[in-house]
Amino acid sequence: MTGSAEYSARRVLPDAPLLAAATGRTPSRRPVWFMRQAGRSLPEYREIRAGIGMLESCFDPALVCEITMQPVRRHDVDAAILFSDIVVPLKAAGIDLDIVAGVGPVVANPIRSIADVAALPRLVPEEVGAIAQAVRLLTTELGSTPLIGFAGAPFTLASYLVEGGPSRNHEKTKALMHSDPKTWHALLGSLADTTICFLQTQLKAGVDAVQLFDSWAGALSLADYREFVLPHSERVFAEVAAAGVPRIHFGVGTGELLGAMGEAGADVVGVDWRIPLDVAAGRVGPGKALQGNLDPAVLFAGPEVIDREVRRIAAEGDRAIEAGAIGHIFNLGHGVLPDTDPTAITSAVELVHSL
């Protein structure tokens, strides 16, 4: 386990609203940021990414810095999130994969056996040195705005490696999980090592919080999540605890898993739009902050609807705090959709800050 001394270069941001809300202190304003806030919804992003592949972009420190900064400048959000992708550490380690436009990550040689797991390359920090350099650039550029680092959770990474790409039903993943638990746990153990290395690299470079994305965990029953996934996510959170920064845990469609996801060790639990925040607070239990949970599609519905729904989410966040949550960070229930009008995002941020 990495000691706290290795994280000593981090900025001190005592007044950052996001960090206050995440740790049970009273923020100076209601903090808000959006998953995928740096991306295709911004014309400046589309311009700077023209002709440059996604993975190539993720390994260019100056480009990562600029893309990460774009929504902070435009929207006045309370955090930047590192521009990257959950498969970046897999690519860096040497796994043969690519991000195909309109499809997503595609893996050349899907995992099928314990021998395949044993052959997986292990990430070392030097292979993600470009990401660490981008973090260092950003901590200089951001001033008093926190930087959130992130990684994919072992289960979601495993799903890509077993399926060979995105999957609606995750049938190959679940088949391996149930039919060959030994291989499954070996795979998730290996991926947990990769995730820990990637997060620790970002933390040592200076990120102020981290988010673990378990994008596909909602495909699982609670019993399967507890048996096959929770121990590995729990180890990830434990191994980065010494950094002393807020740890956020998020998945889509995880309303029935929220209690278990909270048990994994995060300080903040992300909630998608399918469950009210005050209900989520009861499932997560006291002592955690909540993050969420405006439906991303609401941003297409016009100013009156956005105004109403933002106010509703903020009120539910307040009730969640009354129900035992230690704070609320306003966010979407998933990522910003590519065709979202950026002015709708800016307006939503202004409204959140006024409440």
Curated annotation (Swiss-Prot):
Keyword Cytoplasm listed: yes
Alphabetic keyword roster: Cytoplasm, Decarboxylase, Lyase, Porphyrin biosynthesis
InterPro entries tied to this protein: UROD/MetE-like_sf (IPR038071), Uroporphyrinogen_deCO2ase_HemE (IPR006361), Uroporphyrinogen_deCOase (IPR000257)
Binding-site residues, substrate: 36-40, 85, 160, 215, 334
Gene3D superfamilies tied to this protein: 3.20.20.210
GO terms, molecular function: uroporphyrinogen decarboxylase activity
Site (Transition state stabilizer): 85
EC number: 4.1.1.37
A GO cellular component annotation in the UniProt record: cytosol
Biological process, per Gene Ontology: protoporphyrinogen IX biosynthetic process
Keyword Cytoplasm carried by entry: yes
Catalyzed reactions per annotation: uroporphyrinogen III + 4 H(+) = coproporphyrinogen III + 4 CO2
Domain of life according to the entry: Bacteria
Subcellular location: Cytoplasm
SUPFAM superfamilies reported for this sequence: UROD/MetE-like (SSF51726)
Pathway: Porphyrin-containing compound metabolism; protoporphyrin-IX biosynthesis; coproporphyrinogen-III from 5-aminolevulinate: step 4/4
Role of this protein: Catalyzes the decarboxylation of four acetate groups of uroporphyrinogen-III to yield coproporphyrinogen-III.
Protein family membership: Belongs to the uroporphyrinogen decarboxylase family.
Subunit structure: Homodimer.
The protein's name in its UniProt record: Uroporphyrinogen decarboxylase
Species this chain originates from: Rhodococcus erythropolis (strain PR4 / NBRC 100887)
Organism ancestry: Bacteria, Bacillati, Actinomycetota, Actinomycetes, Mycobacteriales
